[in-house]
Amino acid sequence: MAKEKFDRSKPHVNIGTIGHVDHGKTTLTAAITTVLAKKGFADAQAYDQIDGAPEERERGITISTAHVEYQTDNRHYAHVDCPGHADYVKNMITGAAQMDGAILVVSAADGPMPQTREHILLSRQVGVPYIVVFMNKCDMVDDEELLELVEMEIRDLLTEYEFPGDDIPVIKGSALKALQGEADWEAKIDELMEAVDSYIPTPERDTDKPFMMPVEDVFSITGRGTVATGRVERGQVKVGDEVEVIGIEEESKKVVVTGVEMFRKLLDYAEAGDNIGALLRGVAREDIQRGQVLAKPGSITPHTNFKAETYVLTKEEGGRHTPFFNNYRPQFYFRTTDVTGIVTLPEGTEMVMPGDNIELAVELIAPIAIEDGTKFSIREGGRTVGAGVVSNISK
C-alpha cells in the first residue's frame, strides 16, 4: 500500500496511554495502529516495535518513550507509550510528551491498581485535561456484574482526583483479541477512537494563546531604544502592541513594542516559535533582564510561592548521590534563568531520595512569571538534579 501523505488539514492532537504495569497499554497501542491500518489511517506497529522504545534525554533525564502516529476520519494523532512506570513519571513532569488527553488502560481482570491511581494523580497534577478509559482483557471476564463493579471502581477513582468520573467514556474491550484480528473486538477499538475523537477536545493552538516571550538577551540601539531577544513561547505580538515586563523585580512594567525583527528583517508581527528581537519604547537597557518575560498585560503574573510535582534525578542520571532535607536551597531554572528557592517537604516526609517523585512547596527569593503547568529544572552548581511542574500557586 502506498504511504499516505501527512494530512495537515486535520486538526492535530497529542495523546498517550497510561495505567498500571501489564494492564495492556502497549498492546492497546499496537491494536490501535493495526485496526486503523486496515483503513489506511496508520502504519501497523507490532508490540515489539513499540516496546523496544529508544531512550531519549529531556533536560538531562533519560526517558524511554515510544511515539506512534495515526489518524481517524476527523483528526491526526501523535501517541506516546512508555515501557516503565518511572518513564511515565519523568515524561509527565518534564513535559517531554505533552498530552492533550490520555487513554487510561485498566485490566478488567485486576481492576484499578496502585499505578492506576498514581497515573490519575499525576495527570491531575501536571494538567492532562481529559481521560478516556479502556477496560482491557474483557475477554477474560465472563461475569457481567464483575465488569460493572470494576467500571464503578474506576469512575470513583477518577472522581476522587477531580476528573468527571460519571461522564468519562469507558470502553470495554480486548486489545490482544483486536490485535489478533477478531472482528467483534476490533469494533471496540473503533469505539474507543470515536470516544477519543469526540470526548478529547482539539487543543487551542499555541499561536491563539496570549502572547509570551521569555527574555534571553537585552541590548540597546542608540537612538532607537532597547531590544529584548528570545523565542516567542505562545501567542503573537504586533508592532504597536503594549506588553508587560514581568518577573525578578517586584513591579511589572508596561512597554510598547515599536518593532519586531527576525533574521535581520523587519516584521509586522511575530508568533509562537519565532526567534525575534523586540524593540521596546519607554524602557532603559538596565530595566529589563534575562529571566523576565514579555507578555500580554494581565495574562500571567509573578509569584514566589508554589507547590510543584517534582522528579529527583538518580545518581546514574547525573543527579545527587545523597538525599536532601527540609529547607534545601537549590536553584530553580525557569525558561532562561536560575532563581534560588527554599524547599519545604510535605508533612511526615523526613528526606527526599534520588529517584523520588514528590510534591514540594517552594519559596523563590525573587518573583517569576509562573502559572499552573509551568515547567522548571532544579539545579545545583549548574548541573540538573531534578525537574518539576507547578501544580498550585500559593502567593
Swiss-Prot record:
Q: What GO terms fall under cellular component here?
A: cytosol
Superkingdom of this protein's organism: Bacteria
Region entry G3, spans: 81-84
Enzyme class (EC, first level): hydrolase
Tell me how this protein assembles. Monomer.
What organism does the UniProt record list as the source? Listeria innocua serovar 6a (strain ATCC BAA-680 / CLIP 11262)
Q: What terms describe the molecular function in GO for this protein?
A: GTP binding; GTPase activity; translation elongation factor activity
Q: What is this protein called?
A: Elongation factor Tu
Catalytic activity line of the entry:
GTP + H2O = GDP + phosphate + H(+)
Which positions in this protein are listed as binding Mg(2+)? T26
Q: Where is this region: G2?
A: 60-64
Identify the stretch annotated as signal peptide in this record.
Answer: none
